Amino acid sequence: MHWSDGAPLQGVKILDLCRVVSGPFATMLLGDLGADVLKIEEPNNGDEARTYGPPFVGGESAYFLSVNRNKRSCAVDLKSEGGKELILRLASAGDVVIENFRPGTMERLGLGFETLRKANDRLVYCGISGFGRSGPEANRPGYDLILQGESGVMDITGDADGPPTKVGTSIADLVTGLYAAQAVLAALAQRQRTGKGGRVDVSMLDSMASLLTFNAGMYYTSGKSPKRRGNAHPTISPYETFQASDGWFNLGVANDRFWASFCKVMDRPDLMAEPRYARAADRAALRSELKAVLEPIFRERPRDYWTALFAGASIPCGAIKSVGEVCEAPQLVARGVARSMQHPAAGDLRYLASTVRFDDQPPPDARRPPLLGEHTNEILTEWLSMDDAEIANFADKGAFGKSEASLKEGV
């Protein structure tokens, strides 16, 4: 497989009715794989993420720009009769619809799965929500912070003597988007066999709970909820974060073989000879004691000294880097992940590209994130073969809202 053979999802048409992060992240991932993603936006303000900031660059939200590459924007008023008719026609011509409204919203708009399926029985319909379509909490709204707490992830994150702590990125939104993209790919594969589309239901709660993995396993087997341990591992030591003289690093002495290498490279035969540290289970039980021995030693030298020392001995380790360090990392540049593109408002726009590589080749350069309603005419012509008169007729029906800006090329 090679990108020069054509993108994997080339020819797949996706109608993106999503806002903010979870849905847009899913559709961006599918766009990265070559799908033709049509982002439907409210005509006057667009995706609310366009207003999130600072920072803004050239009037564009960095938040919005980060999850909306490889898409085209079409401004449609979903509450107008003309807008609803237009969505029905676009869904009839498309392969996938993805939305992240609260359950029942699309039905109230007259654009629910059953309605769209009647127009196109090959349609894959993916609904993303906070708690799913079923169950006693189905109608609750879903927000990243809320779901980080509801999923149990915050309860096991943070220092043992500190408060529950959220993950530094929007992990609930992002992992849900990952699952949604995966589910859509599976549904398209199934459609290839059966000829029929179907409904995909992706819940933020389900997605986050799935990340508990061994933490859930510990509860199911012991009946006890795991507790916060800071950055320490529950069954391995030393396997946590340590402070150097100028920063922080992670050390993962994951087994007895690594322990022997660690003691040797640290020139600490006394630690290797200590019978109480002989086995991994023993070291885990004496985690606090062992950490107290190592902490003052690690504070004597810089971060990069320790990471180089342990890397030379093939002991798992790594610096704790700032976002800036990561965005400038030579490794990401070399692999084609850290890139730049030109945007008419934002100018030279740097971004982290798709991580998917085929035959060691990174994906082609991405299409820049769209301006609001920039491709309305273009899409209606391509997807629906509309002429100017038909487009004007939909405008008269209120399909594009009160503003005519969305009908102007390049707006």
Where are these regions (language model features)?
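A glycine-rich dinucleotide-binding beta-alpha-beta segment and adjacent secondary-structure elements
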Residues: G312-P364
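Glycine-rich beta-alpha junction loops
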Residues: N44, F131-G132, M204-A209, D246, ...
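Short Gly/Pro-enriched turn/cap motifs at secondary-structure boundaries
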Residues: P55, R229-P234, Y239-E240, A346-L349, ...
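N-terminal helix-loop segment corresponding to the beta1-alpha1 unit
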Residues: M1-K196, L371, N377-V411
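Aromatic-enriched alpha-helical interface/lid elements that frame and gate functional surfaces
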Residues: T235-A313, C317
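C-terminal active-site "lid" helix and adjoining low-complexity regulatory extension at the edge
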Residues: L349, S354-D388
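Oxidoreductase and adenylate-handling cofactor-binding alpha/beta cores
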Residues: G177-G197, S210-T221, C263-P269
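Conserved Rossmann-fold dehydrogenase catalytic segment
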Residues: R133, D161-I171, Q192-M208, K224-P234, ...
